[in-house]
Regions:
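Acidic, Mg2+-coordinating phosphoryl-transfer loop and its flanking beta/alpha structural elements
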Residues: 170-210
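Short acidic-hydrophobic, aromatic-tinged amphipathic segments that line or gate anion-handling sites
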Residues: 136, 208-214
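Short, acidic loop-to-helix structural element flanking the phosphoryl-transfer center
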Residues: 3, 70, 78-110, 116, ...
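Non-catalytic pre-domain segments flanking phosphatase-related domains
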Residues: 1-4, 56-60, 167, 221, ...
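A short, structured active-site edge motif that brings together acidic residues
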Residues: 36-41, 64-70, 129-143
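Active-site neighborhood of HAD-like aspartate-dependent phosphohydrolases
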Residues: 1-41, 53-55
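Substrate-recognition/cap helix-loop segment adjacent to the acidic, metal-dependent catalytic center
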Residues: 26-28, 52, 56, 98-109, ...
Length: 225
């Protein structure tokens, strides 16, 4: 089971997701500054919205979070198509990795903090949404290890084996991806295509770390450990 993170791993969006969140807080609460003081790296959408609400002193009830996420997804559709191609792209080696996974009988899915609709919106912009038919998403759980577990369960189900018998590999670009993999007993392949260097990702405990998946040995590690 291969579970790919989206932001900073599969693709870079040029900040489209952050801009959509900023606009959502601005239109609903008049507070474009709600998320100014923290990084979104490795966070789930629900956790981002919850922390943003706390920053501006609004009670983070589930219904409040849901309403803001609905507005965010609407605005995200606009933001991803406003971004130019030079800033919105698929990272090196990712298409080859996805294709290799499918060709070798892997269950190839997503392991992302994005809510499902937001995930598909981001991937549709670069026409790779149809390569993934399952995953663990930010609307499965607010905590990354739990949504990764849900994605792994779905992948094992597709393979027709119990989760305990499946080799699960999480592909991500932050220590939080690595830690989520560790929490469920999965392997991790970390890529330095986001805000962290390969050394940082090794230090976090990654099973393997590469500058990107086009590097020698990366696809072999993905498929065979």
């Amino acid at each position: 089971v291969l579970l790919f993170d989206i932001d900073g791993t599969l693709i870079t969006t040029g900040g489209a997701g952050r801009q959509a969140i900023v606009r959502a807080f601005s239109t609903v609460y008049g507070r474009p500054d709600a998320c100014d003081h923290f990084s979104f790296g490795g966070m789930t959408d629900r956790a981002i919205v919850r922390l943003g609400l706390e920053q501006i002193g609004v009670a983070a009830a589930d219904a409040t979070i849901d309403a803001l996420l609905t507005r965010y997804v609407e605005l995200l559709e606009e933001e991803v198509w406003k971004m130019d191609d030079a800033r919105y792209r698929v990272h090196a080696g990712m298409l080859e990795a996805i294709d290799a996974g499918h060709a070798n009988g892997c269950a190839v899915g997503l392991g992302t903090g994005n809510v499902r609709t937001g995930a598909m919106t981001k991937l549709r912009r670069v026409r790779i949404h149809e390569r993934f038919d399952f995953g663990g998403f930010g609307d499965d759980h607010e905590l990354r290890p739990e949504l990764i577990r849900r994605g792994a369960e779905r992948g094992a189900q597709k393979l027709g084996v119990p989760l305990a018998e499946a080799r699960v590999v999480v592909i991500g670009d932050t220590p939080k991806d690595v830690q989520a993999a560790q929490a469920i007993g999965a392997e991790s392949i970390a890529v330095a295509t986001g805000d962290y260097r390969a050394d940082d990702l090794w230090a976090a405990g990654a099973t393997h770390a590469f500058e990107d998946l086009s590097r020698p040995g990366a696809i072999e590690a993905l498929l065979n450990g």
